[in-house]
């Protein structure tokens, strides 16, 4: 065991030869390196697999011994300054190492085929491997300086991958947005690190926790400064894990390739913020104000991410807001003191979300044959629908990820999310209500994605399609035309994707009303959550999506197995609550909510809470099915729907309310607009003023002196007439004038 720990420092550096050799090869032998580019996937996966087995061995020893191993090298510069570097192996390191390597390996396998036709294939694998190296270095760091170094390296890799297709202006802007937003959090993190060093004189985790604990217990320090610096440390996690209000970069980060979206959202960048809070939790628990702040930020992020996800058209942005909401659950759990619940959900969510992103990549990959390689079309759920018969395997994989994220047993996220919801009831009733509401919204927006993508018909082909029966109507206006508003008097019940005329619009949530003719039962309908417009084309080629190949399906299959069984690590199969694998791995861990509870599981309470959670989940699924499922395919008599709508729905109020929700969600809560008005526009005006002042004033003075000197020289250059005697005479006169001035000055002074 000691031998294994002594060489743990090598974990982050095992995959390092891959990006180094790719870089050298592209620099010295670019043609030959590009010819054998597909070979580089093998060493990337192989070396990361070695790290995975190393991490598994450490985890097994951790479960058996519950030990903490730290090794530090000290470099003394002088008597006052010394730099210490080392590695820390504990339960948190073991969990994160396994998570990073398993997800990283599967994403690399998937990427080998997904990126095979991309010119930046080698660059992509170099960035991805360096990304994994950075995250492994972060989780094995023993002090805050190392944390900050790898923290910035993670950020750099994420910016490179978000802007991977940098020739696209949208991708370049998304990269810039991620960089600027994270700079705010990273600056706060740096100030917090410097402040903690000023207070404690140490940056080693174990030392600074003990020092601060002693200082607080003896009342020998100002709590204001400790709280301030702890809050600054937390700012780094707020930006990196896309917590409110620094979450705005996350949806735009979807401009990168889909495999990197899976890695960022599952095991690397956004997980880094959760890891940092978990690592610093022994410090934060000493400061109740900080714990309450963490819980508050997490709670806002939970509900904000859920509400912003319900009206997005882009499948990846939908999943991005889903990630934001789930990260809010983890942050909320950490703020409540539920260390185990937060890490449990981090594990289960990572595999489920990786599965969903790889599934969405498979869907996008199949849609590109129909709509081209524009992300605005291939990722747009408006063009999808009816993919069940075209990509059935992908549908099954995506459904498993959807069920897991919704919290349906026996899938992984059910166990972890249910634990957080139970802990929220112990923490505060208000927090519990909001957290449970977000759980219902999660089921709604996830099944919204599933139904829009896989149910119904393939929308891209339906410019003017009618079903065989009048009661089965399906026609859609898809792209590029302006909206035409029509005034109507009667308002009837809404069905998804009904027949519309050219240049008219329908969508997936009631917002505006347009006239439609469908039978005599429904004369006009209202608009649902996002608009679908016309291509302006008369004909479409009858192409259909194809299933992904075996390489991509293999990665998704393994993630399905993880999604099915990884939840078992947190299930107690005996009566003791500390006898499950996760609890053994996390010993010792912080639990502020169950200090006085008995060490036995109350199964009645568990089933009661689980039943309540499932009721909320199924309610969200029902609402999603009500709005988005092709109900017209199953109902022969629409009079019943019209009767229900006429008698029970107050249409005016309903339309107004749904319009508010639509605008809020589709416009990202107006937060980007607020930042644009309050910060960005002001900064731009300041920059323009500085540019004007620099060019017209500073440069103007300098250039004016130069131009004046030039013209003065031109004016007097002919005074001497070109004769040496004239130059000598002028020179003598200048000397005499200088002597006279000097003598005058001396006499006046004395």
Swiss-Prot record:
Recorded hits in Gene3D superfamilies, A to Z, give: 1.20.5.2700
Principal location class: plastid
User: What domain of life does the UniProt record list for this protein's source?
Assistant: Eukaryota
Gene Ontology cellular-component annotations: chloroplast thylakoid membrane
Family membership, please give it: Belongs to the complex I subunit 5 family.
Its UniProt entry gives the catalysed reaction(s) as: a plastoquinone + NADH + (n+1) H(+)(in) = a plastoquinol + NAD(+) + n H(+)(out); a plastoquinone + NADPH + (n+1) H(+)(in) = a plastoquinol + NADP(+) + n H(+)(out)
* Keyword annotations: Chloroplast, Membrane, NAD, NADP, Plastid, Plastoquinone, Quinone, Thylakoid, Translocase, Transmembrane, Transmembrane helix, Transport
| Compartments where located | Plastid, Chloroplast thylakoid membrane
Membrane spanning residue stretches: 9-29, 39-59, 89-109, 125-145, 147-167, 185-205, 219-239, 267-287, 290-310, 327-347, 354-374, 396-416, 427-447, 554-574, 606-626, 728-748
Name of this protein: NAD(P)H-quinone oxidoreductase subunit 5, chloroplastic
Origin species: Phaseolus vulgaris (Kidney bean)
Q: What is its EC number?
A: 7.1.1.-
| One of the record's GO molecular function terms | NADH dehydrogenase (ubiquinone) activity
Kindly state the subunit structure of this protein: NDH is composed of at least 16 different subunits, 5 of which are encoded in the nucleus.
């Amino acid at each position: 065991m000691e031998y294994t720990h002594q060489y743990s420092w090598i974990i982050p550096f095992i995959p390092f030869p891959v990006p180094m050799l790719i870089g050298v090869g592209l620099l010295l032998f670019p043609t030959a390196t590009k010819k054998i580019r597909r070979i580089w996937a093998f060493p990337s996966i192989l070396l990361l697999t070695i790290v995975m087995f190393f991490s598994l061995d450490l985890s097994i020893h951790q479960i058996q011994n519950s030990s903490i191993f730290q090794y530090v090298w000290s470099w003394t510069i002088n008597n006052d300054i010394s730099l210490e570097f080392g590695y820390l192996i504990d339960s948190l390191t073991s969990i994160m190492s396994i998570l990073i390597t398993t997800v990283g390996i599967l994403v690399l396998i998937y990427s080998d085929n997904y990126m095979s036709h991309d010119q930046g294939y080698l660059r992509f694998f170099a960035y991805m491997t360096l990304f994994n190296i950075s995250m492994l270095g972060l989780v094995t760091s023993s002090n805050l300086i190392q944390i900050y170094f790898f923290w910035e390296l993670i950020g750099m890799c994420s910016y490179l991958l978000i802007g991977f297709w940098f020739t696209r202006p949208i991708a370049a802007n998304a990269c810039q947005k991620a960089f600027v937003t994270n700079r705010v959090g990273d600056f706060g993190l740096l100030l917090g690190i410097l402040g903690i060093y000023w207070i404690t004189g140490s940056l080693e985790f174990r030392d600074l926790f003990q020092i601060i604990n002693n200082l607080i217990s003896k009342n020998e320090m100002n709590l204001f400064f400790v709280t301030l610096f702890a809050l600054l440390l937390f700012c780094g996690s707020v930006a990196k894990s896309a917590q409110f209000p620094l979450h705005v970069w996350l949806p735009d980060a979807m401009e990168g390739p889909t495999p990197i979206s899976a890695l960022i959202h599952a095991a690397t960048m956004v997980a880094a913020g959760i890891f940092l809070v978990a690592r610093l939790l022994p410090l934060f628990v000493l400061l109740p104000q900080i714990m309450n702040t963490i819980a508050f930020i997490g709670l806002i992020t939970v509900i904000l991410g859920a509400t912003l996800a319900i009206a997005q058209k882009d499948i990846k942005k939908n999943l991005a807001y889903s990630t934001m909401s789930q990260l809010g659950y983890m942050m909320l759990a950490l703020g409540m003191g539920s260390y185990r619940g937060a890490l449990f959900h981090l594990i289960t969510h990572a595999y489920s979300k990786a599965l969903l992103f790889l599934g969405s990549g498979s869907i996008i990959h199949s849609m590109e044959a129909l709509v081209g390689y524009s992300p605005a079309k291939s990722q747009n759920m408006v063009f999808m629908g009816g993919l069940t018969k075209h990509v059935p395997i992908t549908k099954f994989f995506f459904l498993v990820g959807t069920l897991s994220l919704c919290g349906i047993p026996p899938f992984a996220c059910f166990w972890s999310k249910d634990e957080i919801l139970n802990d929220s009831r112990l923490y505060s009733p208000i927090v519990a209500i909001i957290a449970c509401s977000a759980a219902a919204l999660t089921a709604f927006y996830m099944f919204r994605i599933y139904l829009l993508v896989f149910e119904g018909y393939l929308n891209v082909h339906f410019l003017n399609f009618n079903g065989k029966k009048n009661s089965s109507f399906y026609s859609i206006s898809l792209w590029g035309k302006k909206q035409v508003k029509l005034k109507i008097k009667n308002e009837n019940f809404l069905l998804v994707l009904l027949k519309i005329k050219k240049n008219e619009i329908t969508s997936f949530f009631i917002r505006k009303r347009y006239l439609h003719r469908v039978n005599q039962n429904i004369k006009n309908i209202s608009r649902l959550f996002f608009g679908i417009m016309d291509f302006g084309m008369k004909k479409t080629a009858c192409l259909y999506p194809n299933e992904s190949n075996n390489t991509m399906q293999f990665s998704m299959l393994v993630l399905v197995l993880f999604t099915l069984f990884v939840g078992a690590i947190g299930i107690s199969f005996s009566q003791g609550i500390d006898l499950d694998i996760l609890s053994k791995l996390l010993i010792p861990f912080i639990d502020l909510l169950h200090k006085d509870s008995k060490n036995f599981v109350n199964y009645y309470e568990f089933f009661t809470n689980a039943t309540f959670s499932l009721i909320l989940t199924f309610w969200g699924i029902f609402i999603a099915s009500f709005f988005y499922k092709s109900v017209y395919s199953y109902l022969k008599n629409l009079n019943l729907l019209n009767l229900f709508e006429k008698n029970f729905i107050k249409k005016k109020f309903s339309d107004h309310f749904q319009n508010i929700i639509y605008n809020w969600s589709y416009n990202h809560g107006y937060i980007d607009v607020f930042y644009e008005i309050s910060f960005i526009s002001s900064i731009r005006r300041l920059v323009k003023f500085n540019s004007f002042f620099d060019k017209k004033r500073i440069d103007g003075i300098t250039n004016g002196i130069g131009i004046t000197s030039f013209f003065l020289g031109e004016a007097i250059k002919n005074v001497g007439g070109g004769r040496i005697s004239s130059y000598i005479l002028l020179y003598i006169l200048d000397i005499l004038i200088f002597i006279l001035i000097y003598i005058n000055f001396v006499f006046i002074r004395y």
